[in-house]
């Protein structure tokens, strides 16, 4: 009997991002609203690792993870700079982040799911583009009817924005009103989200090509 080597698919590289021109997306979930620890994908190994305990009272209000086969590089940074009219904006050199809305209770990450993009948050984090795509779980009984972020309940968007604006802030920074490192400079709809995803996908293909040439 032949022995086959063990192989675990890498969540960043192995899944196909989309098969229908960014209408439906494969999403890798890292953390859930039930996690008191922030997990993130270790890009080198493909394993889910502990990044840090969630600070203070902040808990992510939705499923949160990344889009496989995306990378926020040159094209993503340049586009963010164009849209915000700021110079020197770079991609954060990470996969594109995604927030997935669902009414179901999903208690653990390290899973793949299919979701539809409805929009996104244009975020600048310490001078780098760090957009968050907002998507809805396919066939969700509540959120699946949402086609665009303009249809999303304002309270849901408020919770998501509040999390990203405060999850790195200390009480001292908030009390003193110190300048925020994270800025939400815009909210956009489905078509713009698909553009952002496409650019991150193109950045990924360039990044993988450059990495292969170096190796």
From Swiss-Prot:
SUPFAM superfamilies: Inorganic pyrophosphatase (SSF50324). GO terms for molecular function: inorganic diphosphate phosphatase activity; magnesium ion binding. It is an enzyme of class 3 (hydrolase). Substrate binds at residues 38, 52, 64, 167. Mg(2+) 1 binds at residues 92, 97, 130. GO terms for biological process: phosphate-containing compound metabolic process. It is found in: Cytoplasm. Its main location: cytoplasm. It holds the Pfam family Pyrophosphatase. Belongs to the PPase family. Homohexamer. This is Inorganic pyrophosphatase. The lineage of its organism: Bacteria, Pseudomonadati, Chlamydiota, Chlamydiia, Chlamydiales. The gene is ppa.
């Amino acid at each position: 009997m032949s022995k086959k080597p063990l192989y675990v698919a890498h969540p960043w590289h192995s899944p196909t991002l989309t098969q229908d021109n960014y209408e439906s997306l494969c999403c890798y979930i890292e953390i859930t609203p039930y996690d008191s620890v922030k997990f993130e994908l270790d890009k080198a190994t493909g394993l889910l690792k502990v990044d840090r305990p969630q600070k203070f009272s902040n808990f992510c209000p939705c499923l949160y993870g990344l889009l496989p086969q995306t990378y926020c590089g040159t094209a993503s940074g340049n586009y963010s700079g164009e849209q915000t009219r700021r110079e020197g904006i770079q991609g954060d050199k990470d996969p594109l982040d995604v927030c997935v809305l669902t009414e179901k209770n999903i208690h653990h990450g390290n899973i793949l799911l299919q979701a539809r993009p409805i929009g996104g948050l244009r975020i600048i984090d310490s001078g780098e583009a760090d957009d968050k795509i907002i998507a809805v779980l396919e066939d969700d009984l509540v959120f699946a009817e949402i086609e665009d972020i303009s249809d999303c309940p304002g309270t849901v968007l408020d919770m998501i924005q509040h999390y990203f604006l405060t999850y790195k802030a200390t009480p001292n920074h908030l009390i003193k009103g110190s300048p925020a490192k994270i800025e939400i400079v815009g909210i956009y709809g489905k078509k713009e989200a698909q553009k952002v995803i496409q650019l991150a996908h193109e950045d990924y293909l360039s990044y993988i090509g450059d990495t292969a040439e170096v190796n």
